[in-house]
Amino acid sequence: MLEGWFVSAMPDLNHRNPFMARYLIQNSLWWIETLGLGGIRQDTYPYNDPVFMAEWAQAIQTQYPKFTIVGEEWSYNPLRVGYWQQSAPNADGYESHLPSVFDFPLQKALVDALTNKESWDKGLVEWYTALSNDFYYENPKALVFMGDNHDMDRLYTQLSENTNLHHMALALLAMAPRTPQLYYGTEILMQNTAKPHDHGLIRTDFPGGWHGDKINAFTKSGLTSEQKATQTLFAKLFQLRSRSEAMRFGETLHYAPNDGVYVISRFAENEKLVLFLNKNEEDRQIDLSDYKELQGYDQYYD
């Protein structure tokens, strides 16, 4: 949709009016400079005029080359998502100048992979297939990957409040060759199961620091054992990612799931990491000879 209202309460601005277009560009530059912003999340990207959006993004990138802009193309089709990323080889020649786009296809694959029963085309293979589409994207590592956000059910709710699956999701969020976005409360199993799709509940205050709060997630006071364990795992995973060149910038090698087990490796010049993900209820013994490419590891963690 290029003309009309996105919803009745949000009238479109006329981006084809040169005075309006110039004002919006100048206004964006002013706010970036005044507040020292590091990035913009641009909502509902395809609903804007594409020619103007390219001019807007280019103007910002020219003035602030290290500035980040993430566009929201809420589609589960990677072809539509990839179209909007800068330098994409689009058939119509369109150049967006947009550095990053939200990876909704991989978000859906994450949930489907963990909640669907394993079969030849369902379960972990859905994640494997989605990640294998990276050849299409111009810069897949710049895509923003999330388990949930402020507009969809909490990740813990999407996973039917299964803590084991939630922990697997956190591991994939940390390990994926993407730029992760983490919604507050994911680390303490915040959920909206009582009212699915209710934005008020999805956006509930983070517990702790507010008058009358009985739970303080900053100090762990009042958290359940499962919440504490999840918070600890969350911290370990993303502290590791913050130190790891391989997890942030390295190459990726992964294997088709086998018997409910998925293996993914991230590696850089002097570092290798591998994740074995077991979706089964029971332990599985891994035959490392099946993964001959993954040699040279000297530390293992459960």
Predicted regions: what they are:
Residues M1-N14, R203-G212:
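Aromatic- and acidic-residue-enriched carbohydrate-binding clefts of CAZyme catalytic domains
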Residues H15-N27:
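Alpha-helical scaffold elements lining the catalytic groove of polysaccharide deacetylases
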Residues L170-Q191:
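Substrate-binding cleft of secreted/luminal carbohydrate-active enzymes
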Residues F249-E271:
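Surface beta-strand/loop "capping" patches
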Residues F276-N280:
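Asparagine-centered strand-capping/turn motif at beta-strand->loop junctions
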